[in-house]
Amino acid sequence: MESRTVGVEHDVALHVGVAGDGPDVVVLTGGPGCVQYLERDNLSPPGHRAWYPESRGVGRSGGGPHDMERAIADLEAVRTALGVAQWLVLGHSWGGDLAVRYAVEHPDVVRGVIGIAGRGFQRDRHWSEAYEAGLGSEPVVDIEWVPEVNASLSDSFTRWIHEPDLWRRLADCPVPMRLIAAGDDIRPSWPLAQLAALVPHGSFSTVPGVPHNFWSTRPDVWVEAVTDALRDLTR
C-alpha cells in the first residue's frame, strides 16, 4: 500500500492510501470519525486502483471537526489533486451514506456507488430500538475514532436528512447504486431497501451470515461482495 499526502482547503493535509491498478474507486469508512480501517492490501478490490482517504481530523490527516459539506469538498479536492476524472465510490457503514450524498451532489464524477451496511437516511425510533437491543451481540472490532469528528458529522447528517427536497434529489439522481446489507447486522436493513427502490438505478441485496464489520471477520466474503458489485457497475 502506497501512502500519499494531499493538501486541501484551510491548509489541511489529508492522508490517502492507494493500491492496485485499473478503474479508480475511492473507499470511505464509517463512524463517522473512524480511522481508515479499510486501508488493507487484503481488502483491495482486484482489477481496480483503490484510493483510501483518511477524513479530516482523524488519524494521519490534519484538521478537526467538520460537516458533511466539508467532507464532500475534501473528496473533490482529493480527486482533483490526484488527477482522477471519475471514480466509483465504495462506502462501509456511515461511509455508504456519505457516498450516496456525494453522488447526489456530484453525479458527473461519481460513476457508481456501493454502499455496504449503511444506516440509511433516517433517525427512526423503531430502527434505533432494534439496534440498541442487539448491542453486545456483535463481534467486537476495535477501531480508533475521534468523538468530536463523530459528533460534528452526525449533527450535519441529521440536518441533511431533514432537508425538504432530500427525497426529490435522491429520486432524480442518475448514478447507479448497489446497496448491500450484512445478513447478521444488528442494524435493520429496510432503509437500504427503500433507498434502492427510490433511486432510478438502484439495487438491494444481502450478504447472508455476516456481521456489520465483515470486512474484519470475513475479509474473503467482503472482497467477493465488493468485486461482484464493482463488476455489476462497470459492465
Question: Which functions belong to the PLM regions below?
Answer:
Residues V100-V104, V113-E138:
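Flexible "cap/lid" loop of the alpha/beta hydrolase fold
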Residues S152-R169:
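Active-site nucleophile elbow and catalytic-triad environment of alpha/beta-hydrolase enzymes
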Residues V210-V223:
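Catalytic histidine-centered segment of alpha/beta-hydrolase-like enzymes
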Residues C173, L179-A181:
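Short beta-strand/loop motif that positions the catalytic acidic residue
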Residues V8-G62:
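Conserved HGGG/HGGXW glycine-rich cap/lid loop of the alpha/beta-hydrolase fold
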Residues G91, G95, A99:
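Gly/Ala-rich beta-loop-alpha elbow adjacent to hydrolase catalytic centers
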Residues W51-L88, E224:
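Active-site loop/oxyanion-hole signature of alpha/beta-hydrolase fold enzymes
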Residues I186-P191:
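Conserved alpha/beta-hydrolase "acid-adjacent" motif
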